[in-house]
A protein has these predicted regions:
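Juxtamembrane helix-loop-helix connectors linking adjacent transmembrane helices
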Residues: 42-53, 84-155, 173, 242
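Membrane-interface capping segments at transmembrane-helix boundaries
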Residues: 75-82, 262-273
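Hydrophobic core of alpha-helical transmembrane segments in multi-pass integral membrane proteins
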Residues: 63-73, 102-110, 153, 249-267
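Hydrophobic alpha-helical membrane-insertion segments
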Residues: 14-28, 96-113, 210-213
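Hydrophobic alpha-helical transmembrane segments
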Residues: 11-15, 57-58, 95-102, 145-149, ...
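Membrane-interface helix/loop boundary segments of multi-pass membrane proteins
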Residues: 158-183, 210-217
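Alpha-helical transmembrane segments in multi-pass membrane proteins
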Residues: 21-78
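Functionally important transmembrane alpha-helices
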Residues: 18-22, 26-30, 34, 185, ...
Length: 273
């Protein structure tokens, strides 16, 4: 009976954590809009119809900042892994984890190539690729500083606190081993909603979950997530065709050492030589 109660409590907590994301995102976005109305002395109803779309990353960055404060508070109060708590960046091994992050980007690139070349005849994949392309193009419509804050800085912190810091540990309390790695990874994938993103985000989530299971370091998986997003959204001066081609090629090549490093982490529990 106690196991059933613990299971339902974990499921309820996970539901609350996920619901909080959408609630806080809405509140944060609304507060930002009201602030804009106050500064410009414009009634909310008179804001341009495309105001949210044209300022999406600026609004999302503010909402993410609010959300991460709440998640950080919950994470601290929960005191997960109290007796085996390792929450520091393993500085000597940072280059190796950075290489794993690059390999994660390589897997994403390979999946998108496969989806585009092989699966694009499937309607849902074709539509999803088009939507994904539109999302990518929207990155050109705002100042890079807001994209940086939303996609590279605050976004990864929020998502890692949510999926590795909170959800992973809730599942781990019920069932250890591969269960929290896989389930938190799949939820991370579904969280991204767009079908082509769901696939590679699930794979990335499972890899990040595996790294977290071995290191118990939230800052480490935040770093890996940030690096992955940074390489995917380079600043305009670096977003040249030749540079992007080189980066994509390096990411794909990095898949090989990534597999080796993950195997080493699996066998030894550390990447330290």
């Amino acid at each position: 009976m106690k196991k059933i109660i613990k299971l339902f409590q974990a499921i309820l907590n996970i539901f609350i954590f996920l619901a909080l994301y959408y609630i806080l995102s809405f509140i944060g976005s609304l507060l930002f809009l009201l602030f804009c109305c106050f500064i410009t002395k414009t009634p909310l109803r008179l804001l341009p119809p495309n105001f949210i779309d044209s300022n999406f990353f600026m609004i999302d960055g503010f909402a993410c900042f609010l959300t991460l404060l709440v998640y950080l508070l919950i994470y601290k109060l929960k005191k997960y892994n109290k007796n085996r708590y390792i929450n520091k960046l393993p500085r000597k091994d940072i280059p190796k984890y950075a290489l794993i992050s690059m390999g994660m980007g390589g897997l994403s690139a390979l999946w998108l190539i496969f989806a585009d070349k092989i699966l694009s005849s499937i309607t849902i994949v074709k539509n999803s690729l088009q939507n994904f392309s539109q999302i990518s193009e929207s990155l050109n419509n705002e100042a890079y500083i807001f994209i940086f804050l939303s996609v590279i800085l605050f976004g990864p912190i929020v998502e890692e606190l949510l999926f590795r810091g909170l959800i992973f540990n809730e599942i781990d309390k019920i069932k250890g081993g591969a269960a929290p790695i896989i389930l938190s990874g799949l939820l991370f994938g579904l969280f991204h909603r767009e079908p082509v993103q769901v696939v590679y985000a699930s794979i990335l989530g499972i890899i990040l979950g595996f790294v977290y299971s071995k290191t118990r370091s939230v800052p480490l998986v935040i770093f890996m997530h940030m690096l992955n997003n940074l390489v995917a959204t380079l600043p305009p001066p670096l977003a040249k065709h030749e540079i992007l081609q080189f980066v994509n090629g390096f990411q794909i090549i990095s898949v090989i050492p990534m597999v080796y490093l993950l195997y080493k982490l699996y066998k030894k529990g550390s990447l330290t030589s």
